[in-house]
Amino acid sequence: MAGAKEIRSKIASVQNTQKITKAMEMVAASKMRKSQDRMAASRPYAETMRKVIGHLANGNLEYKHPYLEERDVKRVGYLVVSTDRGLCGGLNINLFKKLLAEMKAWSDKGVQCELAMIGSKGVSFFNSVGGNVVAQVTGMGDNPSLSELIGPVKVMLQAYDEGRLDKLYIVSNKFINTMSQVPTITQLLPLPASEDDDLKRKAWDYLYEPDPKALLDTLLRRYVESQVYQGVVENLASEQAARMVAMKAATDNGGSLIKELQLVYNKARQASITQELTEIVSGAAAV
């Protein structure tokens, strides 16, 4: 019964792992609900900022802010939002693949790329593949604050202000639902003109008091910060949803494996009993 004992040991090991994955699934489900609440709370502000900025980009302004002007593209920057922990399926790698494809397209045109990383998985991945990481922040936990994100955002905005970057993008996972998270790359600077037909029809004229430059400087920076924060909270909700689904799949696979091992164990035990009975019958016949 040495084989049967080994199989019993494997079954116990899988059962222990199954308990862990089930617990992780339940924790991820709880965290996902909290992350969804934060995401829903921040969305109205981010969407309103996007609408106001869309009007600005479409309007004929008395002062043309540098963030509104297109440049010849020689260098682009990416704010990349990844997770700090793993066990969330292909969430990170799908995002990185999409970004690598876009970076290759820029590279083919002779354009260089700079990366500001949010999340340790992105830092380790792009350090290993040779990405030009100029800023990073990790370990923000499950309740990130805007103050924690200011570092990488400030580095990229300063590079844009000094003309060292000609475009700035945010790369993150957009939360659609529990089963679907979509890797997205969204242009932050220069501000893209809105594609919303309603905004194009209802152009706004602005009167600035006291000074359009000071007001636009503050407003446009707040816009970038709001979009980055929204990207982070959506990515966090995506992470918890992906982890919950991955752990459920692992738990289900563990159940299937246990059934297979149980069947193998029963066959091994049956074979052992049959062999013992055969030996007893053979011994009795010999007597």
Curated annotation (Swiss-Prot):
It holds the Pfam family ATP-synt. It is found in: Cell inner membrane. One of its GO terms (biological process) is proton motive force-driven plasma membrane ATP synthesis. Disulfide bonds: none annotated. It comes from the Bacteria. It is a peripheral membrane protein. InterPro entries: ATP_synth_F1_ATPase_gsu, ATP_synth_F1_gsu, ATP_synth_F1_gsu_CS. GO terms for molecular function: ATP binding; proton-transporting ATP synthase activity, rotational mechanism. SUPFAM superfamilies: ATP synthase (F1-ATPase), gamma subunit (SSF52943). GO terms for cellular component: plasma membrane; proton-transporting ATP synthase complex. Belongs to the ATPase gamma chain family. HAMAP family: ATP_synth_gamma_bact. F-type ATPases have 2 components, CF(1) - the catalytic core - and CF(0) - the membrane proton channel. CF(1) has five subunits: alpha(3), beta(3), gamma(1), delta(1), epsilon(1). CF(0) has three main subunits: a, b and c. This is ATP synthase gamma chain. It comes from Salmonella arizonae (strain ATCC BAA-731 / CDC346-86 / RSK2980). The lineage of its organism: Bacteria, Pseudomonadati, Pseudomonadota, Gammaproteobacteria, Enterobacterales. The gene is atpG.
